């Protein structure tokens, strides 16, 4: 029995240009204006970006400076090989720099389970705050987080690869 999500996705007409980077930029701009602490974007796309005005480096820089986490689902099985590779690389980069995750299901039917997994991830996120050392230069900085439990040993931690220090909003740093 098909779910409401499957029916909705089945009704989507997949044609024409794809401007996924522009869509992400617009969504990030919108989310940054919000008052909620947790800002998450779920991107579901069917193809390679071939219509965006923003360049990938600029989008990744924007995401690095934002507090928006991106989860990406690429329905790319119908794409030609090169387009699929390009779309996969983009979605992986966007998810990684923002501390999210990317998924590439073979069928539309798998999307509901992935959306449920993303919802679980979002509900189980923590925000880490720390004082930025004095003398820290403006710009991007690498950060690595490891966690260990006495009962379970090493834990899997997914974070952004770093943070962007800006003096006006630098203390405390998040993530």
Regions found by a protein language model. Give the residues of each.
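Scaffold/interface architecture of coatomer-like assemblies
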Residues: 1-175
């Amino acid at each position: 029995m098909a779910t409401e999500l499957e029916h909705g996705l089945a009704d989507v007409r997949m044609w024409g240009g794809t401007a996924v980077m522009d869509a992400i930029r617009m969504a990030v701009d919108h989310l940054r204006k919000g008052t909620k602490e947790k800002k998450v974007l779920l991107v579901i796309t069917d193809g390679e970006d071939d219509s965006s005005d923003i360049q990938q480096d600029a989008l990744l820089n924007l995401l690095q400076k934002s507090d928006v986490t991106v989860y990406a689902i690429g329905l790319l099985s119908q794409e030609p090989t090169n387009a699929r590779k390009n779309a996969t690389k983009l979605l992986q980069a966007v998810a990684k720099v923002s501390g999210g995750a990317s998924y590439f299901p073979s069928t539309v039917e798998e999307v509901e389970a992935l959306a449920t997994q993303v919802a679980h991830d979002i509900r189980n996120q923590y925000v880490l705050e720390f004082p930025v050392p004095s003398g820290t230069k403006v710009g991007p900085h690498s950060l690595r987080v490891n966690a260990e439990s006495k009962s379970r040993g090493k834990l899997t931690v997914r974070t952004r690869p770093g943070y962007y220090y800006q003096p006006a909003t630098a203390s405390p740093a998040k993530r």
